[in-house]
Amino acid sequence: MITAIDTNILLDILAPDPEFLDDSVAALEEAARAGSMIVCDQVYAELCVHFASRRECDEFLRDAEIRVEALSAEASFAASRAWRAYRKQGGQRTRILADFLIGAHAQLQADRLLSRDRGFYRKLFPSLKLLDPSGRR
């Protein structure tokens, strides 16, 4: 079982959010027991902002047993189609392309996505299996 991890889950741990920290840690531990964990390039870039160096970010991911997996051309294309459909349906530009890349990456290169942003992903990636740690309460 491959679990893709969204940035918001990792930020719950890096910038401890008392509301979500325990649930996100438990969900990551559960994902690790179920198989492997990955992040796409976009999540990696968003995560690196919170570290002084690339080495520190890489160590954090290595310690968490999360590997970075590049977005495939197929996933990039799927993200572009989802973005286009979203805009045609009147979707506002409040959603950035990175969100679509994260969803397409998880749909095509993992078995599921661990994220607190389930409404967005459920609507635009209906076949994507989603795990929401806040549902653990």
Per-range role (PLM):
Residues 1-39, 49-59, 131-132, 137:
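Short, well-structured N-terminal submotif of metal-dependent ribonuclease cores
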Residues 7, 41, 98-100, 118:
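Conserved glycosyltransferase catalytic-site signature
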